Regions:
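Transmembrane helix-boundary motif of multi-pass solute transporters/channels
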Residues: 24-64, 247-253
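Transmembrane alpha-helical segments of multi-pass membrane transport proteins and ion-pumping complexes
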Residues: 39, 69-73, 81, 113-124, ...
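Membrane-embedded translocation segments of transport machinery
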Residues: 17-26, 184, 188-257
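Hydrophobic alpha-helical membrane-insertion segments
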Residues: 64-73, 107-129, 193-203
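Inter-helical loop and helix-membrane interface segments of multi-pass membrane transporters/permeases
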Residues: 17-20, 48-52, 82-107, 120-180, ...
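Hydrophobic alpha-helical transmembrane segments of multi-pass membrane proteins
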Residues: 30-36, 62-67, 107-118, 166-173, ...
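Membrane-interface "cap" regions at the ends of multi-pass membrane proteins
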Residues: 7-43, 72-77, 81-103, 257
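Alpha-helical transmembrane segments and their helix-start/interface "positive-inside/aromatic belt" motifs
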Residues: 54-62, 99-117, 184-194
Length: 257
């Protein structure tokens, strides 16, 4: 009882005292989309589709998203909105008398830390290639030449470290500017740009050799390739796509008016 009372008072004292919240629903959607759309969708999802029956895996993924992931997503938003506090103490607010929820909150914070450990490295690589793109380095460059540039980047020490720190610095700058002028403002223009880039990638991929066969494989489900692991992969991909269990959606929910 004393522990639960202390936890409850701590939660109440640490509710988001700020007045800053997302300005409107569009800002919330863009910020949450920025959290959800990532390497798991661009790199991992096509590989999973190719390994598990094409459209058959997409059907499993859609079912997992609609019937499992979306309800959990809504629950995380509601939890954050109701508690108005961090991911850790949002979990603790469920049952202040049971410490397991506090540990679940700490786990929800630890998971993004692990993800950030490699996302930030890849983010540094991306920034280096972005600078090369703007400087015209890739103009008329062959695939082998681009691969050599990447090998040179990863083979050195200081340049990846510098790009890594630059990427982390940019992230910190955005977060330090707050929800409305930082995360929301950045998401409002970066997510549409990301959408345009994805459309360009799709259009370009359709011009590559074997595109017709790939499209046929994509729209014709092959359920014979579905295994028990396929269900687990589809569920995991669905969770990853919506940033579930990582504290991000709970935290964003705390800033929803």
């Amino acid at each position: 009882k004393p522990d639960s009372t202390l936890n409850l008072r701590f939660i109440q004292g640490n509710r988001m005292a700020h007045k800053e919240k997302f300005s409107n629903r569009w800002g919330v959607i863009m910020a949450m989309a920025g959290s959800a759309i990532g390497l798991g969708n661009i790199w991992r999802f096509p590989y999973m589709v190719g390994e598990h029956g094409g459209a058959a895996f997409i059907v499993l993924y859609i079912l997992a998203t609609v019937f499992v992931s979306l309800p959990i997503f809504v629950a995380e938003v509601i939890l954050g909105r109701k508690s108005r506090t961090s991911a850790v103490y949002s979990m603790t607010s469920l049952r202040p008398d049971q410490r397991i929820w506090k540990y679940a909150g700490y786990l929800a914070v630890f998971i993004p830390l692990v993800i950030c450990s490699y996302y930030s490295v890849i983010g540094g690589w991306s920034m280096d290639f972005m600078f090369k793109t703007f400087s015209g380095t890739f103009v008329r460059s062959s695939t082998d030449e681009v691969m050599n540039l990447f090998s040179g980047l990863t083979g050195s020490f200081w340049k990846p470290v510098g790009m890594h720190l630059l990427f982390l610095g940019a992230c910190c700058f955005i977060v330090m500017n707050g929800v409305k002028t930082g995360i929301e403002k950045f998401s409002r223009w970066s997510i549409p740009v990301l959408f345009i880039l994805i459309v360009v990638m799709i259009a370009y991929s359709l011009t590559l050799p074997g595109a017709r066969g790939g499209m046929e494989y994509l729209i014709k489900p092959d359920f014979s390739q579905i295994t028990p692991k396929s269900f687990a992969y589809a569920m995991g991909q669905s969770f990853y796509s919506l940033s579930l269990g990582m504290g991000a959606i709970v935290t964003y929910g705390a800033y929803v008016s």
